[in-house]
Design a protein with these regions (language model features):
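Electropositive, gly/pro-rich neighborhoods at or near active sites that engage anionic ligands
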Residues: 2-167
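Conserved nucleotide-cofactor-binding alpha/beta core module
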Residues: 159-203
């Protein structure tokens, strides 16, 4: 009988231990079992803002497209490594694309994350939400009860959330790897991502 470790590619060994992607990869593949190995990619779209996949069971997954990875994908010498091979993606087993979770090429990794999200959606649709989890419609940000004066730490520069926090006058910090994604008026809230260990413990909401 195969275990989850048998189905995780060796490339995971080169990945930092206990990362969120590695943990999710292992958990989803193990819980789906044979179903994960039977699912194939039906459609893939690499868009300007989002990369999306649809699996053979109709489940879908998204990932933000890393636009800074596009230049290397359109340069002939590097495009073969940077891009999944067009015309040869549909019909591939979803679990095989998960190898790219551990690659350094941004576009390949984005496609792998979207595929992993589609497999996670498959698990959610099959088994329902975990015990104790309440599912609500609408924007998760609206469901947060953030009291005035409570400090917020945003992991990633999400323009609608930053705009709303600024409108409320809420104190907040934005942990972001790429400061160029922030507008000039948002830069006072920017904190380099590597400072997360000192910023997150000081936040009331993150």
């Amino acid at each position: 009988m195969k275990t989850a470790n048998d189905m995780i590619p060796s490339r995971m060994a080169d990945c930092p231990p206990a990362t969120l992607l590695a943990d999710l990869h292992a958990a989803v593949v193990e819980r789906l079992g044979a179903e994960a190995r039977a699912l194939t990619l039906e459609r893939v779209v690499l868009g300007i803002f989002f990369t999306g996949v649809r699996l053979s069971n109709g489940a879908g997954g998204l990932c933000a497209t890393p636009v800074k990875g596009v230049p290397e994908a359109v340069c002939c010498p590097s495009s073969a490594k940077a891009m999944p091979t067009p015309g040869k993606i549909a019909g591939r087993r979803a679990v095989d694309l998960l190898d790219d979770l551990y690659r350094t090429q941004d576009l390949r990794r984005a496609l792998a994350i979207a595929t992993l999200n589609a497999l996670a959606e498959t698990l959610w649709l099959r088994d329902g939400p975990p015990a104790g989890v309440e599912c609500l419609d609408g924007d998760a940000f609206d469901a947060l009860k953030i009291e005035p004066g409570r400090r917020v730490a945003l992991v990633g520069a999400f323009p609608p959330y930053m705009r709303e926090l600024r409108r409320r006058g809420q104190p907040f910090s934005v942990l972001e790897m790429d400061p160029s994604t922030l507008r000039p008026e948002e830069m006072p809230f920017y904190v380099p991502a590597e400072r997360a260990p000192e910023v997150v413990p000081l936040a009331d909401v993150f």
